[in-house]
Curated annotation (Swiss-Prot):
Protein name per UniProt: Ribosome maturation factor RimM
Localization in the cell: Cytoplasm
Ranges annotated as spanning the membrane: none
Any Pfam family the entry gives: PRC_RimM
Classification lineage: Bacteria, Pseudomonadati, Pseudomonadota, Betaproteobacteria, Burkholderiales
Any single GO CC term annotated in Swiss-Prot or TrEMBL for this entry: ribosome
PANTHER family: RIBOSOME MATURATION FACTOR RIMM (PTHR33692:SF1)
Cross-referenced NCBIfam families: 16S_RimM
Natural source organism: Burkholderia mallei (strain NCTC 10229)
UniProt entry tagged with the keyword Cytoplasm: yes
UniProt keywords, alphabetically: Chaperone, Cytoplasm, Ribosome biogenesis, rRNA processing
Domain of life: Bacteria
PRC barrel domain boundaries: 149-230
Family named by the database record: Belongs to the RimM family.
């Protein structure tokens, strides 16, 4: 079986998923040495642009405060319980709200219904949490949970070339779609309209083993059993 997992970089209007495997949520213990109610001035700090990680991937957004003790509620772009895994695993978050960027060390994170709730160290009350509302949340790609050999995060698939087994170029993966059963590659390619003008064509290829024969990340391509005239 081959499963595609959303990284959180897919189009935001959809509700994509990390894949078919739901992992058990992990609740982290508070960081050693942290004291309840004490504000760590470095915990939520203004972050210099040069310290933003090169492999940062947007995985969610702060939508509200949760409770009275500084917890925040988040919407995972990929859906909590699956896409929310990156939010649950990563201890270091980078937050962007407008032009301001902040770094947060997360002491606890867990699933709550269809959302993720978390406690950033230094967020001591509801007002502190509300100040983070609307922030986009990024984590390092390197902090994503490890996958099985036949699973792939969407962020690693988007941008790859798609060719068929005869070597015919079919385009590039522009986006991934979740139809509720499996992932679908949205492949774009240069085409010509009826008026003779250039346009962008589109192919929708299911990301399942019957069509996807190889994912060659080192070569930057996906090999499929698919014809150009389908």
């Amino acid at each position: 079986m081959m499963a595609g997992h959303d990284s959180g970089n897919a189009k935001r209007g959809r509700s994509p998923s990390f894949g078919v495997f739901v992992r058990k949520p992990v609740e982290r213990a508070p960081a050693k040495g942290a004291s309840d109610g004490a504000v760590d001035s470095q915990a939520i700090r203004i972050d210099a642009a040069q310290s933003w990680p090169d492999d940062a991937v947007e995985v969610g957004a702060v939508v509200d405060a949760y409770g009275l003790k500084g917890w925040v509620k988040l919407a995972a772009h990929a859906g909590a319980g699956r896409g929310g895994d990156a939010l649950l695993k990563a201890r270091d978050w980078w937050l962007q709200k407008g032009a301001e960027r902040k770094f947060a060390r997360v002491t606890q994170a867990k699933l709550h219904g269809d959302t993720v709730v978390a406690h950033p160290d230094g967020s001591v009350d509801r007002d502190t949490a509300l100040a983070l509302r609307g922030a986009r949340v990024f984590v390092r790609r390197g902090d994503f949970p490890a996958l099985a050999a036949d699973e792939f995060y969407w962020v690693d698939l988007i941008g790859l070339d798609v060719v068929n087994e005869a070597g015919v170029a079919l385009g590039k993966i522009a986006d991934m779609i979740d139809n509720g059963v499996h992932s679908i590659m949205r492949v774009e390619y240069p085409a010509t309209g009826k008026d003779g003008r250039p346009k962008t064509g589109e192919r929708l290829i299911p990301f399942v083993g019957v069509y996807v024969k190889a994912v060659e990340q080192a070569a930057g391509r996906v090999v499929v059993d698919w014809e150009a005239d389908y």
